[in-house]
């Protein structure tokens, strides 16, 4: 069996990293696998694509994204967030034909990489792993409160459009026309995304299977907290909360508008002197937001070992997103034995078992988010149990060998008709 994974990048971004882990898992399970990308950031010979160090190619990739976004110029009042028309012709199908795989496993193929119409020219069995909602919407990657993807989109709230025949409906129509005869098998990492796909007008008749992303649990593992903090120069005498980049302040989906007031309120409580915040994914901004707590900005951590060290150094990972699939950050955290707190939405309930290995706050309830943080920290014996359960779940459900086995079964079924 010869498998080809197709992704915009190999290790740049959460979806790319999840795909690259699948590549590693399949190859470790002796499945002949390559990964075709628009932007190659690793030195892995199993990844086919031009290295990101090529200045001319970098410029070409940037130009494709800029051109892909041109139709959005007609919607100057649109909300911040990703929206992908995917209208540019591409050479991807020719590259796939040259590699001649038995089965093609699409992943995140946006940023102008793969044209919607190109899929119709793929004369290969296609398994499409969804990392967000884009494949079955009119262009948005997360629909927020909108359910127009269950019909034909149009009057798109993210475009601030009042017209039914807007860009979102045209993109939806392009997908329906191009994909209606394709024999697609859909894989989603979370049950929530599987349910959304089943409700969608585009994928309601497809085979849909849920397979969680995987993680190398020999790399993401608990490391002595004292040692981890010493290496990262973090305080030994404080409880540390971890959050991802605050660069999504303008993107309401990231939930900063819930995190900020929660931390500010905690800072005014008896816990205020005991807690500090750690932020990774960005350096300290010139005008940092007022979060109430002393904040350590660690910048981007580019390798798995540094990330494992970070998760092991903190007490809780806080994920305040209002809509999300199966974020790598939560999986990485629990693999390191660090409990997580998130709202009871999206794919979080797949990973976080309430008061067993973490805490699921009532959706968008700031008080419950605060209560959850305090509940996790206030009993050391209970905390130890949460940490043990978190690690056990990651090993049992998310190890790369398990991921590869599930995908191998799907590929075999697809090839056997």
Stretches with model-predicted labels:
Residues 368, 375, 382-397, 403-409:
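A short, well-ordered alpha-helix in the C-terminal region of glycosyltransferases
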Residues 235-254, 260-263:
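Conserved donor-binding/catalytic core segment of Leloir-type glycosyltransferases
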Residues 339-342, 352:
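Short hydrophobic beta-strand element within catalytic cores of glycosyltransferases
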Residues 322:
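Aromatic "clamp/platform" in nucleotide-sugar-dependent glycosyltransferases that forms part
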Residues 309-314:
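Short alpha-helical donor nucleotide-sugar binding micro-motif in glycosyltransferases
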Residues 137-142, 162-210, 215-225:
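A short, active-site helix/loop in glycosyltransferases that binds the activated sugar's phosphate group
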Residues 354-355, 359-366, 375-380:
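Conserved acidic donor-binding segment of nucleotide-sugar-dependent glycosyltransferases
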